């Protein structure tokens, strides 16, 4: 997502998975220097105050660093071309898998001695068409996909380092004076956090912030502070989704244009304080099926 200039809201019901991911991304090393990866960890007043200190630190770290623009443009163009080829290859592969499944289904139906008219349609129409499409796509080898992956770690880290610097340096633009005024304010942490939360509650300000920090990490409950309840991020990634109740999960979900749920169906369900008797009465009143039982399910298991 970062290399394709997409914005991401990384959310979870609990702090632990969020902190683990943020910590790893903030500790990427390039030739003895920490990559100033543009991710912002938001949350309660304490987390928000820490985020403001992070913004100030990254700004001071990056503002004087030279950025090899031409090199970045070349690397970006190369990676974009490879990503496009890889996407096309994966789409072909998915299509081949679909065709193979259709072929197997047709062959099973033929073995079942279907009615004559239906059998003729399968043998003379559908099966030859599927075979023609499979022949046209040809064989797709794993090596074809591996060849398109970026295997040069040094070059990748260099690109990541200078691209991150490029993002952070945008804070020097005049449009960010109001944000930097909050960051540099002499107010106490609680007052600064309140001012920042008011700032990002405005959709236009959130949009500006995402030009500098395209990756935002926060808990589901704290995501309500991010602009209006409408899609502001290209993608929402929800970790430990099997422990997120449906209602709380909707807070980050409705802020993204696409969604990735990461979870384990064997994990315990979320802790929900709704009385079982009330839940049963509400299910009966609104004809809620078992699959959508609020107590028994999570956003991952629905």
Predicted regions and their residues:
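P-loop NTPase Walker
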Residues: 1-98, 105-108
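Generic, well-ordered alpha-helical scaffold segments in large soluble proteins
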Residues: 1-4, 20-24, 28, 216, ...
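Short, glycine/acidic-rich beta->alpha junctions
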Residues: 2, 13, 17, 198, ...
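Beta-sheet entry/capping signal
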Residues: 7-9, 38-39, 214-216, 234-235, ...
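Feature representing long, continuous alpha-helical segments
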Residues: 16-19, 23, 211, 215, ...
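A general structural signal for short secondary-structure junctions and capping/turn motifs
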Residues: 31-33, 206-210, 250-253
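Conserved helicase NTPase catalytic core signature
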Residues: 110-233
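Conserved helicase motor core of SF1/SF2 NTP-dependent helicases
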Residues: 221-238, 242-302
């Amino acid at each position: 997502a970062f290399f394709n200039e997409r914005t991401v809201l990384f959310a979870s019901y609990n702090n632990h998975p969020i902190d683990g991911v943020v910590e790893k991304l903030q500790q990427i090393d390039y030739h003895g220097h920490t990559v100033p990866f543009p991710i912002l960890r938001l949350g309660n007043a304490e987390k928000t105050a820490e985020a403001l200190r992070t913004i100030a630190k990254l700004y001071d770290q990056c503002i004087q660093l030279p950025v090899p623009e031409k090199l970045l443009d070349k690397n970006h163009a190369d990676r974009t071309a490879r990503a496009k080829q890889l996407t096309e290859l994966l789409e072909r592969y998915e299509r081949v898998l679909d065709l193979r499944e259709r072929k197997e289904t047709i062959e099973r139906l033929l073995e079942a001695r279907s009615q004559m008219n239906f059998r003729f349609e399968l043998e003379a129409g559908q099966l030859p068409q599927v075979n023609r499409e499979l022949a046209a796509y040809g064989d797709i080898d794993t090596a074809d996909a591996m060849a398109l992956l970026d295997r040069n770690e040094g070059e990748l880290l260099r690109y990541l380092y200078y691209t991150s610097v490029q993002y952070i340096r945008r804070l020097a633009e005049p449009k960010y004076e109001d944000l930097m005024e909050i960051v540099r304010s002499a107010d106490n942490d609680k007052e600064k956090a309140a001012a920042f939360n008011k700032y990002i509650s405005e959709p236009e300000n959130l949009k500006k912030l995402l030009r500098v920090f395209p990756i935002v990490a926060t808990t589901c409950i704290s995501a309500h502070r991010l602009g209006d309840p409408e899609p502001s991020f290209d993608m929402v990634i929800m970790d430990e989704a099997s422990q997120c109740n449906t209602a709380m999960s909707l807070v980050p979900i409705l802020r993204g244009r696409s969604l990735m749920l990461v979870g384990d169906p064997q994990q315990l369900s979320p802790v929900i304080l709704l009385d079982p008797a009330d839940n049963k009465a509400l299910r009966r009143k609104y004809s809620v099926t078992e699959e959508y039982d609020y107590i028994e399910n999570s956003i991952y298991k629905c």
